[in-house]
Design a protein with these regions (language model features):
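Extracytoplasmic "Venus flytrap"/periplasmic binding protein-like
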Residues: 57, 61-129, 165-167, 268, ...
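Extracytoplasmic/periplasmic solute-binding protein
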Residues: 140-149, 154, 179-231, 274
């Protein structure tokens, strides 16, 4: 799962942004029919196991609306396969692996059904299940072209042994604010407990803000995305606080601007090079048996209560595609697959969280026996993903270039980031 977020954002660069739609937006309620449908799911072994059981249960009760399911065809990426199918007009009805970053391109191709206008209960079902998190997946027209499905909320992992070696409380570490983290970093460095404190991917790749700035900014800003209302947001007071925090980490040698020689995502923490790490619940698989770790919410400038701390969701969603003949069955299957029982089964089978506001209640017994996952559960309703915007690749790369020059480098932070915001605003205006 370590490259999950990066793969989702990478999708944006590989997809053809068609100048004209190759299909309608699927908003005609009068055209809704029922019957057999086809779906795709990811090649992840655990997700396949979950999907097969859900499909089997559905088919047993709906012989006239049979669901045929298969893994996304092999290729360069699942996004490439979906885009090619949209162009050819032969997509399945549903894809249970739709990356939020790819939705603008799929929508521009005319491949996605407008769920808000096509189904009478579209808005009610999605917002009723996912709450305010659904708003982060809305397209610029305000409608939903994807069903929020599952999330991997990012939190801050800490190495208990390294904190103890630095004379810090390893069981209840003080890491709520930026100043707390910087104070801990000073102690860790002075004690020689770790080479670095935080060591996120350091290269200039446009996906890397998802592993340093963006999760921290979401936490500090109350869930504000990089772009909102047609403008870049990161030069706000909250954005500058986060940028200055990271600049201090690099300036003091608490973080490294050199690319890590191993796994850039999980490696520094798993290998004992960094005392802190940023990851979702997938991090446990990389850290178990290697690090004696704990997990806390991401810090903010002033300190934010855990139940109010937003974070990056690293989500994958479900798209309903316009070439589907039996859209009503597809929609009914979506709702069935995301009922409480099937959402619980998703968590139990894959370790990934359904994006539902009551996940802690639905999975109470399971989470009671899995304390690490229970820690992440409270963050699920507070997850936010990348903004649904055109030119997303260029926008994120513009931000990353400015980051490298001013946060990791020596350029003036205010003028460099202000210039990047102006460039991003121009890219947004291009549409």
């Amino acid at each position: 799962m370590k490259r999950y977020a990066a793969a989702a954002l990478v999708a944006a660069v590989a997809l053809p942004l068609m100048a004209c739609s190759t299909g309608d937006q699927g908003g005609d309620k009068s055209a809704l029919t029922s019957g057999p449908i086809k779906i795709w799911y990811s090649t992840n072994e655990q997700e396949i196991a979950w999907a097969e059981k859900v499909v089997e249960a559905w088919n047993a009760d709906h012989p006239d609306e049979k669901v045929t399911a298969e893994a996304i065809p092999a290729g360069k990426s699942s996004e490439d396969a979906i885009s090619a199918a949209i162009t050819a007009g032969n997509t399945p009805c549903l894809v249970y692996n739709t990356a939020p970053a790819a939705v603008p391109a799929f929508q521009k191709q005319g491949g996605l059904v407008d769920l808000s206008t096509t189904f009478a209960d579209g808005e009610d079902f999605i917002t009723g299940r996912s709450g305010g998190a659904a708003d982060g997946f809305r397209s610029p027209d305000g409608d939903l072209y994807q069903v929020p499905w599952k999330a991997n909320p990012f939190m801050l992992y800490y190495n208990k042994d390294m904190l103890a070696a630095a004379g810090l409380d390893a069981d209840n570490p003080k890491l709520e604010t930026y100043d707390d983290v910087l104070a801990a970093a000073k102690a860790i460095k002075a004690a020689g407990a770790a080479d670095y404190v935080l060591y996120p991917p350091a290269s200039g790749d446009y996906t890397n803000p998802l592993f340093d700035f963006y999760p921290f900014y979401l936490a500090n800003s109350g869930g504000t995305q990089l772009v909102a209302d047609g403008k870049a947001t990161f030069t706000s007071a909250e954005g500058v606080e986060t940028l200055e925090f990271w600049k201090t980490l690099y300036a003091e040698g608490y973080s490294s601007a050199e690319a890590y020689s191993g796994d850039a995502w999980a490696g520094p923490f798993a290998d004992g090079v960094a005392a802190l790490g940023i990851a979702g619940p997938w991090g446990a698989g990389a850290f178990d048996g290697k690090v004696n770790y704990g997990v806390v919410p991401l810090p903010t400038a002033a300190g934010t209560a855990p139940e109010e701390t937003y974070t990056f969701g690293d989500s994958k969603n479900v798209g309903l595609y316009t070439s589907c003949e039996n859209k009503q069955t597809a929609w009914d299957f979506v709702k069935f697959s995301m009922n409480a029982d099937n959402d619980l089964a998703l968590l139990e089978t894959t370790g990934q969280f359904p994006i539902r506001t009551d996940v802690a209640e639905v999975a109470a017994d399971y989470l009671a026996s899995n304390p690490l996952l229970a820690t992440f559960a409270s963050s699920v309703p507070l997850t936010v993903d990348v903004p649904n915007i055109a030119n997303s690749t260029e926008i994120w790369q513009t931000f990353r270039d400015a980051w490298g020059a001013s946060v990791q480098g020596q350029d003036d932070l205010t003028s460099t980031m202000g210039g990047a915001a102006d460039k991003i605003d121009a890219l947004i205006a291009q549409g």
